[in-house]
Amino acid sequence: MQRKAITSVLFLLSLIAGVLPLQAQKDNRFEVSKNLEIFNALVKEVEMFYVDSIDIEKAVRRGIHAMLSGLDPYTEYIPEENMGDLQLITTGEYGGMGALIRQRGTSGEGVVIAEPYEGMPAALAGLKAGDLILSVDTTNTSGKTSDEVSRLLKGIPNTKMTLVIQRPGEKKTRKIDIVRKQIIITTVPYYGVYGDSTGYIYLSNFTDKSAQEIKEAFEDLRQNKHIESLVIDLRGNGGGVLESAVQIVGMFVPKGSEVISTKGKIRQWDRIYRTSIEPLDTVMPLAVLINGNSASASEIVAGGLQDLDRAVLIGSRSFGKGLVQAPRELPYDGKLKVTMSKYYIPSGRCIQQLDYTHRKADGSVAAIPDSLTSVFYTANGRQVRDGGGIRPDFEAEEPDLPAMLYYLTNDNILFDFATDWAQKHITIPPAEDFTLSDDDFEALKAFAKEKNFTYDRQSTKVLNQLKDVARFEGYLAEDSTLFSALETKLTPDTEHDFDRFKPEIKKILAVEIIKRYYYQRGEMIENLKSDIILEKALQVLADKELYIQTLRAPEPQP
């Protein structure tokens, strides 16, 4: 009798368990239908009765943005006119002239060429960094944003456009005819050899061509440069196409290795991604460089190679994006890029740092504290943790840049000086040999003074806030001597600060100048001349015992 009762209870529980989800789905569908009906009626009523005319498209898009931004930063609506941006992210291709443009200033100063790409139509037509775009064909660009100008410049390959530009230092404008081409942006802008025999490959982002580009770079380094170890640099790489990350891991681990699994609301769409290609090399010592801007697909590569004990990681903790997005078709040729799942790397951990499902009362998102993370184990039994990104095996922090550099960059002092400098120097030595002279640095100081460059330290702003607090509490007069001394100490001395931060300023200026001659490749060469993270990687790879010991299973505790 008791067994029969238990069986009956279990049957009822199973029945309830089956009914509750169905009821929940039914209730949820009703809520969706009800709120769509309300929204539809609301838009009609506002459009009909609001006292002024309304741009319905803008109003609805603001509503869409508000709804999606409350979910996470990665779920977004992509209207038809922005589909080219999605294509660029996934393929690295677009129809245009091949140049980076940017807004100059914040007061409608126009849009300028920031960086032509090597070998692309813009560079071949003679466009240079600093050129102000006045018009594209018959459209005046005055007052337009960089996004608006970008849409004018992009188009169907092999179509012609005419640009009118103003070159700094010239009174007359220039008219330049350009034929748009299919622009393919490489994701491996630079690779080379460092130390005695260590290959270096920089990957800027992940498109559907990245794996092939990595393969070609690696094979060139191995066959023609005879490298014995390899560094893959993922610093600043915000991710991209997931499948490319899996393919890159597959080049260095045995075929059939699990790289990630994805889990979402729709269980039928859960997937396990395994390597499907024959590896290029499974034994060569390998280091991966990461930092706080290494995210998503970068973390799949770094985390996968760490969990499989195939590479040592060097740098600082990665961003912590453990979410996967996929596009969904929408009416009128739009798309919804929606977060559909979380991903888990080989040890079983999810490295998502921010918990978007549990927001604070003010709507902000909290990071998962280290105390709440869990321990997982690599293939060799090394301890790793979930949440909060990927932690490197060797911590090495990039030096902080002085605030003065931010203002020199934001006020276009370095950019404009480099433009002026390049107009006076037709050629420069190879990027590997280029150095900025002290005379050039003094010329920069004079240039900044001529432009009336000044800046405010953050410490000065904080001091003013502290004075306000002291005034409120009635202690300002009593502490006036102390505040005066601090104010004197913290008042920016531009001349002094130029000399104090001379090495850092010269470094950034050298990069800005070299780009004018050797493009992104030259920029990379200059940046790597004194890179402490790369130097640490070279040290670890050169110490074979340290490298092996780092990846080895821990000794069992007695």
Regions found by a protein language model. Give the residues of each.
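Cleft-lining beta-strand/loop regions that shape enzyme active-site pockets
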Residues: 22-35, 39-56, 88, 112-116, ...
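Conserved functional hotspot residues or short segments at active or partner-binding sites
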Residues: 350-357, 361-558
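Polar, glycine-rich mid-to-C-terminal structural blocks
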Residues: 297, 309, 316, 320-380, ...
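Extended, small/polar residue-biased N-terminal targeting/export presequences
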Residues: 50-111, 158-180, 184-190, 528-538, ...
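Bacterial N-terminal signal peptides
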Residues: 9-18
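Bacterial N-terminal signal peptides that target proteins for export
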Residues: 1-9
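Structural motif
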Residues: 130-132
